[in-house]
Each structure stands twice: as structure tokens, then as C-alpha cells.
Amino acid sequence: MTVKAFILIDTSPGKAREVANKIRQVKGVSMAHAVTGPHDIIAIAEAPDVTTLGELVVQGIQSVAGVNRSLTSIVAD
């Protein structure tokens, strides 16, 4: 069963579009957009299991230059 998550990302000021472009290139990320509101980017990612999803977030998203913080919400339905 595939695990899907919405990831809310905060970036350094003025970096949202650049960071979103980099995040789109991460394997497992199906979408990443710069948005308005309390967070700078919303991304959707999928992985075969929770462990792999965690690795994707930590190694693939949080390691992108300009990412300050992320909040991951796993889809429940």
C-alpha cells in the first residue's frame, strides 16, 4: 500500500519558488507549489511505506537549501 502525504514547507524569505522547483525534482514528490498563507510551499509525496516517506522528507526535502521547516500530514483515507 502506498503512503501519501501533504507536506507544508516554510522557506527563507524570497526563496519559495526556487525551493519548490528543487522539491519537484525529488523522487516521490508528485507536486510542489509556492502558495500564499502561513506556509510557503505545499507538496504531495508518495512512498511505499512510512519509513521510506520519512527518509524522503528528511533526506529529499528538508535537505534542500532554503527549507527552514516542514510539517508532514499523512493521508488517512
What name fits each language-model region?
Residues 1-77:
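A compositional/biophysical signature of low hydrophobicity enriched in polar/charged and small residues
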